[in-house]
Amino acid sequence: PIPTFYKRLQAGQGCFCSDTVRDFLDMSDFLELMDRVMDSGAPSGIYNISTGEGHTIKEIFDIVVSHLGLRLDEPVPIVPPGDDDVPAVVLDPSETERRLDWQAKIGFEETIRRMLAWYDEYGVTDVYSHLKAGLGQASRGE
């Protein structure tokens, strides 16, 4: 939802948030673990690579709104998860942390802010979503 929110809000278009929770991992943390595993001959197995922390889509929306300096004309609609969506996806990384001596270092807000800084510099071209276009309007804040 991050590039979708960014692009739509930049264009003054409305958005909505699905009432879902997700576990967001910074790619730097992921890649650091991949480098470590490939270089060390770590034990094989199935690992959850995650923070173990759940965050609502609305939390992301609020960070994007703040980053863009927007003032909403009305609250963003929160809609129930669609038939093809899952209410919550939060993984338990404890086995990964224990067996690979690894833990995510970059927090949720920092991860989102890094993505937004990248969008500020390079823009957002195409966005892909299984969700239908949303509601609500935003305007530039003072």
What are the functions of these language-model segments?
Residues 9-142:
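C-terminal substrate-binding subdomain of Rossmann-fold SDR/epimerase-dehydratase oxidoreductases
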